[in-house]
Amino acid sequence: MDFEKKIKDDRESLIRDIMKLVSIDSVESKPAEGMPFGEGPAKALQCYLDLAEEAGLQTENFDNYAGHADYGNGEETVGILGHVDVVPCGEGWICDPFRPRIIDGKLYGRGVLDNKGPMVVCLHAVKILKEMGIPLSKKIRLIVGANEETD
């Protein structure tokens, strides 16, 4: 099976996973035990790492500050960096920003573009590489933070 076909076949799963992560309100809030940036960012980080584990990647959560998911065994590592927290929603939303929806073929919700959606796309790309057994000379590490959007 070629890579492009596999990507097309993965579309529904990709959209489902983006919607799952976007549905978590991950605006920074009051810190709590084990959640340095509040409950939402911690939940979003764990959700992302759970998706990575389901894809067969090795994960590690660094006390809800950040985490990573690895694939491959090379001595060198290629890092892909992103985050799962979002800025406060502000005014002007005509629908709940944490209830993602598809309208006219476009996915809407807080974090779809910055940065939950792109990180899930990266995860699915790595998952497809793994499923296809494509050999890598370097390890791929998806590094995800829970506190990029704060002051």
What are these regions (language model features)?
Residues 115-116, 120-151:
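Acidic/histidine-rich catalytic neighborhood of metal-dependent amide-processing enzymes
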